[in-house]
Amino acid sequence: MQIVQKTNGRSMKRVLLSSALLLVSTLTFAQSKVSGTVKDANGDPLIGVSVMEVGTNNGAVTDINGNYTLNVKPGAKLKLSYIGFTPQTVKAGSNSQIVLQEDNTALNEVVVVGYGTMRRKDVTSSITTVKAEDLNQGVFTDPGQMLQGKVPGLVVSSTADPNGSPTITLRGASTLRTGAMSPYYVVDGIPGVDISIVSPEDIESIDVLRDATATAIYGSKAANGVIIITTKKGSKERTNVTYNGYVAIDNILKKYDVCTADDLRQYAKDNNITLKDGGANTDWQDEVLRTGISHNHNVNISGGNGSTNYMVSADLRKREGVIKMTGFDRFNVRSLVSTKTLKDHLTISIGANMMYGKHFGVPSGNEGASVLDAMNYYSPTNAVKNADGTWTVGSGSKNYNPLALMEENKSETVWKRNQFVGKTALELWKGLVWNVNYSWSNYQSTYSAYNTRNSQLEGIGNKNGQATRNTYFGREQTFETYLNYNFTAGKNKFDLMAGYSWEEKKNNDGFGLSVEGYYNDDLGWYNMSYAQTILGVQNSVQSGYLEKVRNISFYGRVNYSFDSRYMLQATIRRDGSSVFGKNNRWGTFPSVSAAWNITEEKFMQNQHIFDNLKLRAGYGISGNTMGFDVYSSYNTYGASGTFVYDGKTYRTYGATKNANPDLKWESTGMLNIGLDFAFLKGRLNGTVEVYHKKTKDLIWSYPVSTTQYIYGWMDANVGEMTNKGIEFTLNAVPVRAKNFMWSTTLNLSHNKNTVDKMQNETFHTTNLTQGDPMVAGVSADGWTQRIMEGEPIGTFYTYQYAGTVNGRSEYYVLDENGNRTGETTNNPSLKDRSITGCAQPKLNAGWNNTLTYKNWSLNAFITGVFGNDIYNSPRAHYTAAQMFSDGKNVLKEFLSNPVGDASSSLPSDRYIEKGSYVRLQTLSLSYTFRNCFNDWIQDLTLYGTANNLFTITSYKGLDPEVNMGGIDPGIDYRWSRYPHTRTFMVGVKINFGGSKKK
């Protein structure tokens, strides 16, 4: 028995040993070695092709000869991927010679144009498309901020003010009217939409139409360029729920280096000066500033079936400003349902959008009544409050305690906006589609402000509380119908479009009221009936004047392509508007452009350098009606003052505008020439563009004789302006390895602006002075810029600083030709001014880099501005001798200035500084978990983003990114410029895949 058991034990060991050897042998032979060569259609080897075993992380990369070797399991499949080529999946070992075909996705991608779409390959105009994943990341409230640095020629001056909007200029200023330089926005085919109704998280892509051949189809609204926003749509395959949320903190980038209380005391002691000393040592910047906390939550639900799809999104965002008591809350809802019927010949879409926002602000007026100003000038020797709990008060006038400004003068603005959209597209027969779009929207804004009985504002503190509320309404309607017809005849391809548009806007319907005399401050602006007095007739009741504007348009476009080699496009739009004079209600805006796909020619078929080479050229005319109301060309009358009769105050009325029946829109003609190129199988591609933009009939208000006209000024079309420049874009994939890729994009732009004409035989003005920063010690002629014929907007025209002589700032004396006489003076005259700088940059740059390794992604985005000047008015103001003598704080730089230098702050090149800078605008790191959870979560992405990490600049102010819009660019205004911030945010994006439709 025991022998049997022993024998069985030995047998078992042999069996186990044999099994182990068999298993090892099996595993060894299960990994078979496969090899092959990857080439392109021309037989050239492809280097760096990713060869991956499907369903595993096992892979290899082709060598310099296109060869690869890989150990794979039996029956495995290989996926081959290479930039610029269509991915291909093959059975391992089935073919040692693999040919990858070029991927024409980039050329065949759809580009959104006015009233339609086109293949990128067929585009003859200048259009830049930015996908959602390529937009700037950060705590943004405006889609314009997401484009900063992404589009050549598009200059975006951002702001950290949670209640502010960026200024946007495309290819230079085209008007002299402030507020009329912004591009025209189109959202999902609906023109003129207020983009506050669009949540940044809902954006699918943004197309920027940059030249007149692309924008002319929008006629009189398109001189400043057109930005087309496409939002996300529903899905037909499955119900998708996506959540995207983040939390962020903001801190100020830099503080002014103002004096401490001890600095002021030491300065007064050293110079035997009496100091108005409150006995404290307060850091007012610390008292006013805070770390702003923001959060955003966006939920997007989409789904559908074969004929119907839907999308609903809700977006809740809250942002605190770095100035205490500033911020906003906003809630957006967006919905869209689309369905196809009549055997898919009819598509009907219905959408509804809503926005509710509440903005909180603090005083930001000039003349010292601004928290942004007071936190720098209010003396650090003053305490926050007196011993009895009341606010400390600065000596003299316009010397406000910044915390008192905030706490005792509160305001908020509530915005409500609704939009309803209906769209139909009926295919009448193959290639012919009839589109009908209708949009209706309304808005309401309500402003509320309350000044308590403790307010330090002049004329307010003795009112026992003053409340102001006003509310205004507006409604807009847009109806458009157009036909698209495309067909092919042999090698000839046609795409025709013709349409009609009708718009109506009713704005400014509202009123306001101010009251005073409350029993206490508990109610604020609520229950205004409790106040004792309605303010006097001069400023008590505010009333809007209802205006109705109508625009009617007819438009058309022809696109022709022969054999994908030669393309021609012609557009025309005829616009009529009620805002202009009766003699010029209608205008025509044509354009024509052509393109030559050189690489499609037979003589290019055997070359191996260019993958794409296309030459484009075009000329078009577009207009500018922004900033006009229904009364722009009419005589108008309004309240012009008051008079007292029999002890009562009455209004007086007088003329406020002259009629001009010849007033018409400004028109901009633009010539654009572009070259598109691609090398190395698409790994290197880009565009070079040159343009010449001429704007005529610039509108300005000119002085006229009151013996001939009822009012002393008249709006007229007189001026001319030119912008010309060059733009360059380069996209590249320098590294593409097994699990790693580096992609980069560089864009550069240069624009030269010139004011060509400002007067004619009827209307005269030699120059226009602009940009008065209201600096202490400058009682008159504080302006710093002049608009002149032959010079660009933003030309600084100041005195030339000569240094300090005997404790006084001296300036060069100029002769009648503007040359220095060799003499200096501390009391210069206007003739001693000259051109001393220019705010226009010579170069704008944006450089984006994305590195991906497996599921990791790192993005770094750098922006730069070069060759511009900035007028540092805060430095001029906070170093003025008058500031110290008035008991206000100053910069530490002041301590080294001569005592009592009364002329130090005059507008001069002493305060004009180089504004060039390079900034790491965005650094973002993310990790995506894919298919790591159950069927209900497709992927989850964790990300962290930092904005404005560092800036390289020689500018001495807070930040070199000053406002570059308007007609006074490049001036650093102290009282209205919200400080820029450094932002850190962390977020998560979860895609709940849901279940597929059966």
Predicted regions and their residues:
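C-terminal substrate/ligand-recognition segments
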Residues: K842-G867, Y911-N931
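Short, small/polar-rich motifs associated with maturation and membrane association
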Residues: M1-S335, K340-T341, L346-M355, T392, ...
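Solvent-exposed loop/turn segments connecting transmembrane beta-strands
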Residues: I323-K324, S578-N583
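Residues on the lipid-exposed face of transmembrane beta-strands in outer-membrane beta-barrel proteins
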Residues: T231, T260, V299-G303, S335-T339, ...
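Short secondary-structure subsegments characteristic of cysteine-rich extracellular domains
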Residues: F328-K340, R585-A595, L940-F950
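Surface-exposed loop/interface segments of Gram-negative outer-membrane beta-barrel transport/assembly proteins
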Residues: S235-N281, V322-K324, N332-Q419, N435-I552, ...
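C-terminal structured "cap/appendage" subdomains that terminate the fold
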Residues: T922-I952, I967
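Transmembrane beta-strand segments that form the barrel wall of outer-membrane beta-barrel proteins
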Residues: G245, A314-E320, L568-S577, A617-Y619, ...
